[in-house]
Amino acid sequence: FHRNRLGFLADENVIFSRAGDFFSFFPETVTNVLDSDPIDVAVSHTKVATLRHATSYNTSLMLFADQAQFQLTAKDSLTPRTTAINVTTEFTIEPDAKPVSAGTSLYFGVPMGKHTGIKEYEVQPLTYNNDAADVTAHCPNYIPQGLFKLASSDIEDTIIALSTEER
């Protein structure tokens, strides 16, 4: 659910319902494109980019594929004409664990051989560059492989990682 539209990920596409009508995925007319019409937009990348997760971040929607991250943006309102998807970073992710936000950052898992790392995605305040720092660099063997769930608490400044493997 994003900006009063119900959305789905379908391979490389993001599909949104009509504005305010969550179960309508067909345009009102075929001769004109209305601002309230459904949206069906694809990511464009040199690698195969099957979308795995979508997470709200700041005023946009972050889209996660196996080897790249994208940002879905729209000026003012989300319409078929104003929607754009741009590549922000290119990190390999753990596909089973949905990224979580805490404060001004977004966290996601990355495979590291027999272990898993956690990246902290944020937009740099002065340069507006997108980057993801490895917040587990000081303990690279702490989280075992098989990450399937991330949970966050901004009150406790904590990220919880659940894995299928034992430590």
Task: Tell where the protein language model's regions lie, with residue ranges.
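Acidic/polar low-complexity surface segments
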Residues: 22-38
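Beta-sheet-dominated scaffold domains
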Residues: 13, 19-20, 42-167
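Short conserved active-site loop signatures built around small residues
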Residues: 6
